[in-house]
Amino acid sequence: MRQAHYDLPADGASLRPRAFWRLVGRLEHETLEFKRSAHHLRDAIPAMAMSAGGAIVLGVTDERDLAGRPLDQETLDRITAAASECGVEVAVREITVGRVPLTIVLVPAIRDRIVTTPDGRLLRRIGSTNQPLRGDAVSRFVRARLVT
C-alpha cells in the first residue's frame, strides 16, 4: 500500500524493523524511493517534485537491507547540494530502525513552476523510476502547469 510522505515517522523517531516495513512497504513507487547513500539524488529530487512529491529513504539497499545512513554533515551537504541545484527546498529527518540510523528526504510536489535536473532534463516519477519527458509530452506538461 502506498503511504504519503507525511505518514512517515517524525524526526528522531525509533521503530522496530517490522513496524518500519509495515509503515512504508518494501516496494518503491511514485512517492517512495530507497537509496543506500545520498550520492545519487540529482534525478530523484526533481522527478518527485514534478510528480506527487514523496520521500527518499537513505540507508536502504536494493535488496531492502537496512545498511544505515546517519544524518551526518556529509549526508546533509549532499542532500542540500542536490536540492539546491534543482531549486527544490526539501525537509530532512533522521530516524532509527532497530539500531540502524536512516535519513529521510521529504520532497514537496511543485505545481507552480518547472523543476529540471542540473543538466536541464525534465523528469517525472513513473512507478519506481525517474522518466524523462520527451517531444510533445514536454509541451503538454508545461501547458498543463501554466493553466493551473
What is each stretch, according to the model?
Residues M1-T148:
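Conserved N-terminal catalytic/coupling substructures associated with nucleotide/phosphate chemistry
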